A protein has these predicted regions:
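HhH-family (HhH-GPD) DNA N-glycosylase catalytic core used in base-excision repair
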Residues: 14-207
Length: 207
């Protein structure tokens, strides 16, 4: 085993030890939430395809649990061409019928139609700003907001930033982008660090 492998192993052991002593955020109590919490939630995303995926998944969650969406995530990727907006924007009636028959996703006609609409609006934003990343991150000044929450009841459902994001996305004809959904998107993509300060991931993502 070379030095890099030893280093990786030591880091993994230390991280596991920390998580055994310092509790995760309480919503991450079982899989698939645990892995998502430890590896993705709150990690800054600047890849446009990744941002589009979270935008669609957060909208799909409306009225459902995030656990439900995580369990369907791979099915969503397959059903929606790996979340490539340029392909989804060209979906027609045949694609909608195909998706409505797909038991691996949320078969809601409004949400499916919204995904197609959002793909078109997403491409328009890319054309205007160069990247969706540049547009979306402008709502937090281009860098993560480092919050210092101590308990889950301290975490808001929306903020002034998510309100502003929601208003502008709606103006650009995006669907399923209310302020609460926008704040969940901000949390997921690392625009805000909402891991509790008692969670080891908070410190890891604060740098």
């Amino acid at each position: 085993m070379d030095v890099r492998c030893w280093t990786f192993s030591i880091v993994a052991v230390v991280k596991a030890a920390l998580l055994s002593v310092m509790p995760r955020c309480s919503w991450a109590a079982s899989e698939p939430n645990v892995t998502y919490h430890d590896e993705e939630w709150g990690v800054p995303v600047h890849d446009d395809r990744g941002l589009f995926e979270f935008l669609i998944l957060e909208g799909a969650q409306a009225g459902l649990s995030w656990t439900t969406i995580l369990k369907k995530r791979e099915n969503y990727r397959k059903a929606f061409d790996e979340f490539r907006p340029e392909k989804i924007a060209r979906y027609g009636a045949r694609d909608v019928r195909r998706l409505l028959r797909n038991e691996g996703i949320v078969r809601n006609r409004l949400k499916i139609a919204a995904t197609i609409t959002n793909a078109k609006s997403f491409l328009a934003v890319q054309k205007e700003f160069g990247t969706f990343d540049a547009y979306l991150w402008s709502f937090v000044g281009g860098k993560p907001i480092q919050n210092q929450r101590r308990k889950m009841t301290d975490v808001p459902a929306r903020t002034t930033q998510s309100d502003a994001m929601s208003r502008d996305l709606l103006r650009r004809r995006f669907k399923f982008v209310g302020s609460t959904i926008c704040y969940a998107l901000m949390q997921a993509t690392g625009m805000v660090n909402d891991h509790l300060v008692t969670c080891p991931r908070h410190a890891e993502l604060a740098h």
